[in-house]
Every structure is written in structure tokens, then in C-alpha cells.
Amino acid sequence: MSRGALIVFEGLDKSGKTTQCMNIMESIPSNTIKYLNFPQRSTVTGKMIDDYLTRKKTYNDHIVNLLFCANRWEFASFIQEQLEQGITLIVDRYAFSGVAYAAAKGASMTLSKSYESGLPKPDLVIFLESGSKEINRNVGEEIYEDVEFQQKVLQEYKKMIEEGDIHWQIISSEFEEDVKKELIKNIVIEAIHTVTGPVGQLWM
């Protein structure tokens, strides 16, 4: 039995990640495809993260970074097991978000990556570009929904993309929604059909 693919959607806030994940789940109906999003706010760490994001509690930046990281590690075994059982996972945000947001707040990218080192490695990361309209919409109730901060996050994402150690697919914000939906579907189908070898380890 071939293993499943780990396919991650990344991008700035309000770039359409969840929408595109749901499009995939609807357009490729299968009992071998599951959706997972981060942070998972139902766990102990997830509830602490939710309190922070909704401004109910404050933590220093180092604690915040570790909380997000721990939240992903809580699901590392689950992800590994699902992939080995032939289940493809469509993941809304992953370690790259954690590193980009932490680095945008001044943390060392190298240190932030070390916390995530060893997580299951994605077979594909789809990065959704944000147009000026989407970026300017990044003003909201949650703590990171700030235009200036989101621009800093974008620069950190670009650094990771340029490293070339992960298979990134960048989706332009200029595509019409129906074109974007079809393009992403085809990219995901190809990734599922071409996945080979054991699950890798991220940043090892």
C-alpha cells in the first residue's frame, strides 16, 4: 500500500487557505483524504493559544512560539500514522507559519526551526499569495491581524521558499477564483499520485 501525501497550505492571514482546503475536500471526495488545521484549539495548548490570539491573555514571545510548536508536536504521531496508512492529509498551516510569525517578531529563524525539526515533512507546500486587497483586509480582532506585521511575515516566508529544501508551489493572487481552484486541485492530485518513499523528517 502506498502512503498518503502530506500537503500543506500556507499564506498570510485571509489569503484563502481554509477556503482552498475546503475546495479540495469537496472536489476530491475520498475516504483516503482528511483535513487538519493548526493551531488545533481544542487541546490544552490550543486553548492557551486561542486565549492569546483573541487577546484574553498575554504571554511573552518565546512562550508563544513554544506553544504553537507544542501544538503541532501533539499531532506528529497522528500525522505519521495517517500517512503510513495511506491517508493523504490536507493541512491548513504547519511549521512554516510558526517559523515565519516567530521570525517576524524578532526570533531567530534557525532557533525556531530547531523546535520543529523532526516533524513529518510535507511532500508539498502550497503558498497562496495575497493581493493588496487581501493584505489591506488584515485588520481584525486577533492579535496578528495587522497589515504591517503581515508584511514582515511575508518576508520571512520568502526566505524559507528561497532555501529550496521544501517543495513549494506558489499560487498567484491574480488568478480568478475558479481558475485558482482548478489549478490547485490538479496540483494536489499530481502530488497524491506521485508521492514515493517513506515520510521524511522536517529540517533534519
Swiss-Prot record:
Enzyme class label = transferase
Q: Which GO terms describe its molecular function?
A: ATP binding; dTMP kinase activity; nucleoside diphosphate kinase activity
> Matching SUPFAM superfamilies, A to Z?
P-loop containing nucleoside triphosphate hydrolases (SSF52540)
**Entry keyword set:** ATP-binding, Kinase, Nucleotide biosynthesis, Nucleotide-binding, Transferase
- A Pfam family recorded for this sequence: Thymidylate_kin
- Residues reported in the UniProt entry to bind ATP: 11-18
| InterPro entries hit by this protein | P-loop_NTPase, Thymidylate_kin-like_dom, Thymidylate_kin_CS, Thymidylate_kinase
What EC numbers are recorded for this enzyme? Answer: 2.7.4.9
Record pathway: Pyrimidine metabolism; dTTP biosynthesis
* Catalyzed chemical reaction(s): dTMP + ATP = dTDP + ADP
Q: Which GO terms describe its biological process?
A: dTDP biosynthetic process; dTTP biosynthetic process; dUDP biosynthetic process
Domain of life from the UniProt record: Viruses
What family, per the record?
A: Belongs to the thymidylate kinase family.
Tell me the protein's name.
Thymidylate kinase
Q: Which organism is it from?
A: Cowpox virus (strain GRI-90 / Grishak)
